Amino acid sequence: MSESGIKKLSQERTREWLASQEDEELESIAESSVVDSLDYDYTEEEEDADQNTSEEISTMTLGTQIATKKHSIISDTIRDLMNSINSIQTLGNVNISNSTNVHIGNVTNINGNIQIIADGLTQNRRDRRHVSPPRDNAPKTPTHFEDDYQDESEERVRSDVFIRRQKFKIPKELSAIIPRSSWLAQKPMDEPLPLQLPVKYVVILHTATESSEKRAINVRLIRDMQCFHIESRGWNDIAYNFLVGCDGNIYEGRGWKTVGAHTLGYNRISLGISFIGCFMKELPTADALNMCRNLLARGVEDGHISTDYRLICHCQCNSTESPGRRLYEEIQTWPHFYNIEEEEQ
């Protein structure tokens, strides 16, 4: 067959292919348009403001967001945006030969920020990750996303938009414990010893290091401490069960169920909670103190700490200034504080 005949046959096959496509498939071709959102310009001033408030910043990439129907306007806005940029082109004759990575349809570039701020949400964030299957007798709301499950209070919103940053205001009292994986902890050198629960004693210490109200600095301090405890002290892991930062966060050390290496003579019968910093002349921040009290209450509620536990400080058990004179004075005013000296007398 001649070259002109091959070219003509190729054109005919292309026309047949285009004619055979359903509207749905053509729309999917159009939806492959590129939507690019530039990174949000995050300045040091804004970072400092975030550290001094109760805001948590989370990053969402291309994927799925679950929102309540109260905020269904978010999905409508995204859907309108996608519909406006994904208009279907009218295609004429198409001839493709000796080509790779061919794109048919619009290519739309959006140079700008797309930020969604959802406020007024009262449920736990994990509740929003759950999507209930549709009820048999529940009326089905017609949407463009018929495969998504939804109920009376939630709907799943799909889009091809990159949402770089989304801010939620979360009360510090409800903040979860930051797990070891978040501060890139190395694994224990040996198999950890299990702690017999519930524990009778809780020991308060300080790390005798610098303190900071910035999470990034506290993470660095904790990693340095773990490295020092393992390599210089020869211990199995970081000494403490939990650490409290002046940023108002609780950081997981050895956790609830593992024997620590914080207080000689008390490691097997207590939890060690250490404040990050040195508190000889000043107290930790109010957020740090509140979070420590919340951690104690959570330990009792979850069965890790005895209901009649005894709260003691490191300086009462060993010859040390820890947790610092100023913090020691504060701990003496807390419920469950136990005066070992009176018992010995």
Swiss-Prot record:
One of its GO terms (biological process) is defense response to Gram-negative bacterium. Residues 1-16 have a biased composition (Basic and acidic residues). The keyword Protein transport does not apply. Residues 198-324 form the N-acetylmuramoyl-L-alanine amidase domain. The keyword Glycoprotein applies. Expressed in hemolymph. Localizes at the lumenal surface of the trachea (at protein level). Changing E231L: Loss of peptidoglycan-induced oligomerization. Loss of DAP-type peptidoglycan muropeptide recognition. Keywords: Glycoprotein, Immunity, Innate immunity, Secreted. Glycans are attached at N52, N95, N98, N106, N318. One of its GO terms (molecular function) is zinc ion binding. Residues 1-38, 124-152 are annotated as: Disordered. It is found in: Secreted. Peptidoglycan-recognition protein that plays a key role in innate immunity by binding to murein peptidoglycans (PGN) of Gram-negative bacteria and activating the imd/Relish pathway. Has no activity against on Gram-positive bacteria. Binds to diaminopimelic acid-type PGN (DAP-type PGN), an activator of the imd/Relish pathway. Functions synergistically with PGRP-LC in producing resistance to E.coli and B.megaterium infections, which have the DAP-type peptidoglycan. Monomer. Peptidoglycan binding induces oligomerization. This is Peptidoglycan-recognition protein LE. It comes from Drosophila melanogaster. The gene is PGRP-LE.
